[in-house]
């Protein structure tokens, strides 16, 4: 496996393997990881979801309490979906990672090497930036709460152990909330940066295809082949990129779509909380921090998926810029068919096939969340 290709997923795999999401070869490790996965999903994920649901149901008549819980509940629902989705498709994900190192996706020549190296560096920086940002947001939510007012739990959840501040039961629930939120943070870092890295890889392949299209007809040599041979080779390469894009979409669209839906709930609840709880400085600080992190999370997913679509839109122009007027009739006919196919742009679609992940979707999410917030505030007043 090429070390360059591993940059797109190796760090994220290691991060997610803390939660035992990947298949194991040895029987002993399979048993250990299965036990750890059941422990994580039942105790740290589903139980946490249940406590949040019970708290919301017990406080339906108190809008402020519902809002304080709903933004964490929606986040937890999104990260639960990600965990279950990765575990259910872990074998297919492993096959996808191996496929990235196929000969057909490897760069040829200095220009392509530079494009691939830039994509690797971009993926690494994104992973590190997003991880640092997420841990910083987690720290800003938990540490000020403990330092300034540890008499209140970090999160609003159902408390079956009583409200006796300072008791062992209280600190047990306090630590449980902190660790459960950390599990959610780890999942989001691994999954979101993995999705973005795969989108960067797809965009990198489209950039390489554009370079190869530009070279068609320029080097008619024994090694370079005729124009017709070069066209056929690029058509096959484009077909492999399309197949890879469909595989990525099939594996990722469901959890990302659920994340988008949950994000609308989170943003709406946070808009409302920021407007209503402006007098409670510590609570306001937590909501503003979380709101910023959530917006960046959605932006990253939509932006890098949108880059794939945007680069795909440029490919017909790249083919048209070649010296096709000097080619023979058969080559021009193949080029015309190829150009017609290139007009079918690549899109990473949501569960609704009419929508793709792009900046337009990001704008719609923010506008929709603010509209729901305005409606909620009007109804509540």
UniProtKB/Swiss-Prot annotation:
GO terms for biological process: detection of chemical stimulus involved in sensory perception of smell; sensory perception of smell; signal transduction. One of its GO terms (molecular function) is odorant binding. It is found in: Cell membrane. Isoform A is expressed in a subset of 17 olfactory receptor neurons in the maxillary palp. Glycans are attached at residue 59. GO terms for cellular component: dendrite membrane; membrane; plasma membrane. It comes from the Eukaryota. Its main location: membrane. The keyword Protein transport does not apply. Keywords: Cell membrane, Glycoprotein, Membrane, Olfaction, Receptor, Sensory transduction, Transducer, Transmembrane, Transmembrane helix. Odorant receptor which mediates acceptance or avoidance behavior, depending on its substrates. The odorant receptor repertoire encodes a large collection of odor stimuli that vary widely in identity, intensity, and duration. May form a complex with Orco to form odorant-sensing units, providing sensitive and prolonged odorant signaling and calcium permeability. Interacts with Orco. Complexes exist early in the endomembrane system in olfactory sensory neurons (OSNs), coupling these complexes to the conserved ciliary trafficking pathway. Belongs to the insect chemoreceptor superfamily. Heteromeric odorant receptor channel (TC 1.A.69) family. Or2a subfamily. This is Odorant receptor 46a, isoform A. It comes from Drosophila melanogaster (Fruit fly). The gene is Or46a.
């Amino acid at each position: 496996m090429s070390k360059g290709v591993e940059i797109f997923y190796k760090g994220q795999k290691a991060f997610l393997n803390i939660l035992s999401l990947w298949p194991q070869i040895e029987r002993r490790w399979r048993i250990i990881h299965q036990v750890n996965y059941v422990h994580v999903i039942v105790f740290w994920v589903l139980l946490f979801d249940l406590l949040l649901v019970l708290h919301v149901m017990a406080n339906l008549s108190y809008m402020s309490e519902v809002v304080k819980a709903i933004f964490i509940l929606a986040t937890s629902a999104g990260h639960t979906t990600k965990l279950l989705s990765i575990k259910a498709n872990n074998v297919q994900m492993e096959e996808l990672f191996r496929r990235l190192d196929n000969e057909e996706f490897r760069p040829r020549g200095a220009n392509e090497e530079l494009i691939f190296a830039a994509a690797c560096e971009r993926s690494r920086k994104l992973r590190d930036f997003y991880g640092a940002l997420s841990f910083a947001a987690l720290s800003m939510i938990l540490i000020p709460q403990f330092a300034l007012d540890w008499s209140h739990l970090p999160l609003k959840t159902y408390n079956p152990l009583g409200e006796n501040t300072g008791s062992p039961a209280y600190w047990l629930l306090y630590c449980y909330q902190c660790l459960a939120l950390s599990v959610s943070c780890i999942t989001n870092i691994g999954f979101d940066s993995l999705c973005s890295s795969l989108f960067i890889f797809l965009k990198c392949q489209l950039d390489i295809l554009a370079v190869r299209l530009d070279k068609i007809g320029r080097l008619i040599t024994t090694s370079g082949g005729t124009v017709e041979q070069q066209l056929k080779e690029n058509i096959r390469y484009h077909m492999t990129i399309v197949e890879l894009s469909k595989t990525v979409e099939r594996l990722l669209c469901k959890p990302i779509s659920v994340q988008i839906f949950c994000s609308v709930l989170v943003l709406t609840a946070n808009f409302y909380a920021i407007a209503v709880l402006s007098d409670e400085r510590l609570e306001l600080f937590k909501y503003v921090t979380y709101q910023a992190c959530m917006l960046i999370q959605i932006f990253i997913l939509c932006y890098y998926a949108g880059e794939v679509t945007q680069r795909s839109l440029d490919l017909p122009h790249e083919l048209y810029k070649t010296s096709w007027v000097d080619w023979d009739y058969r080559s021009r006919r193949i080029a015309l068919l190829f150009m017609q196919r290139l007009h079918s742009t690549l899109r990473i679609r949501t569960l609704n096939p009419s929508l793709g992940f792009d900046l337009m979707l990001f704008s719609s999410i923010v506008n929709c969340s603010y509209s729901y917030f305005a409606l909620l505030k009007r109804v509540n007043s």
